[in-house]
Amino acid sequence: MIIFKDLLTGDEMFTDSSKYKVVDGCLYEVECRHISRRHGDIQLDGANPSQEEADEATDDIVESGLDLVLNQRLIETGFSKNDYKVYLKGYTKALQDKWKEMEKSESEINEAKTKLTEAVKKVLPKLSDLQFFMGESSNPDGLIALLEYRQVDEKEVPIMMFFKHGLDEEKV
């Protein structure tokens, strides 16, 4: 399994158990699903609860939402367009410092900055239609995931977007 973690905070943002793709080498787009589950349950794709277990759902609290948000404990936040631009300035500066700390070469840093700029240009025009989510630590300096609802095959599909160069892949 691959866990995609926020490079700055270490928060788990998503795993490869979700359907995802890389767009133009700069954005991860992760398909989400609406789910309902008993409080505390984590349902992974392919998991099959035992049919012999008694159903104890009668007294349990049921939570509903997007699988990615519930499983990774992402926290919704809000931004105006101006606030988001201010956030991006601080975020890109912190990322560049992190890349230097990781001893990335100048050419790697320049390529990552170019890709990050490309990703920002893709999301800024649709900012008013997006929802914003931060990682479990609620650190406002970390990566902010962007949620967009798109029409796919006449169905509304929630797609969570992450800046590729703000994530670290951890194989477990």
Curated annotation (Swiss-Prot):
Gene Ontology CC terms, in alphabetical order:
cytoplasm; extracellular region
What SUPFAM superfamilies would the database entry show? Answer: Mss4-like
Which keywords belong to this entry? Secreted
Signal peptide positions on this chain: none
Domain (TCTP): residue spans on this chain:
1-172
Q: What is the purpose of this protein? A: Venom protein that causes edema, enhances vascular permeability and is likely related to the inflammatory activity of the venom.
Family of the protein in this entry: Belongs to the TCTP family.
Which organism does this record belong to? Loxosceles intermedia (Brown spider)
Protein name listed in UniProt: Translationally-controlled tumor protein homolog
Q: What is the lineage of its organism?
A: Eukaryota, Metazoa, Ecdysozoa, Arthropoda, Chelicerata
A Pfam match is: TCTP
Molecular function as annotated in GO: calcium ion binding
The miscellaneous annotation reads: Secretion of this protein from cells may proceed via an ER/Golgi-independent pathway, probably mediated by secreted vesicles called exosomes.
